[in-house]
């Protein structure tokens, strides 16, 4: 979703994002693939697409200034960087969501984006960890077995594999190949 992002961008805005796979914050929560994965953990924490893409932006020095989506993803964004402006447009409750009116959502998003872009957006830059340890939990043990053949991947249980690197691009490459 951020494959065209490069250093020429001033900022990254994320609209319509959702909580990480296995989260109860949204019945549609997933990370990259709900049909293949239970969850992804990055350095021991559940990883969302927001986090994966934010780290990709960080490799290029592009700040993540705005996130909208469910309440869970907005809380995660502010945990990663309290300066990221967020707008929660829905809240997951069991197998459903409670959403604000679409016109109100558009209005809040527009106001928040205009506001954050007038501020010092450098405060929204995300610091990358020095090392990355990714755990993938597959729904099917055969997918984990297949993924275990990726160079550097270690199978740690029938459904889970782990990959480590100091280079975030290698993490992205691995995700592209095994998910």
Segments predicted by a language model, with ranges:
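Solvent-exposed alpha-helices and their adjacent loops that cap or buttress functional pockets
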Residues: 3-7, 56-59, 78, 126-130
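Glycine-rich beta-alpha junction loops
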Residues: 18, 71, 91-94, 138-142
């Amino acid at each position: 979703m951020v494959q065209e992002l490069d250093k020429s961008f001033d900022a990254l805005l994320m609209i319509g994002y959702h909580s990480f796979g296995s989260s109860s914050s949204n019945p549609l929560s997933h990370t990259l693939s709900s049909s293949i994965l239970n969850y992804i953990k990055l350095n021991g924490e559940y990883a969302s697409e927001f986090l994966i893409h934010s780290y990709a932006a960080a490799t290029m020095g592009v700040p993540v200034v705005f996130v909208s989506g469910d309440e869970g993803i907005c809380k995660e964004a502010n945990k990663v960087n309290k300066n990221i402006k967020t707008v929660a447009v829905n809240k997951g409750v069991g197998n459903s969501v409670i959403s604000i009116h679409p016109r109100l959502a558009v209005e809040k998003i527009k106001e928040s984006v205009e506001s954050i872009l007038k501020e010092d957006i450098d405060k929204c830059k995300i610091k990358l960890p020095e090392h990355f340890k990714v755990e993938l939990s597959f729904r099917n043990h055969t997918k984990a077995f297949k993924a275990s053949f990726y160079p550097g991947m270690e199978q740690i249980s029938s459904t889970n594999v782990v990959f480590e690197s100091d280079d975030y691009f290698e993490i992205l490459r691995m995700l592209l190949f095994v998910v």
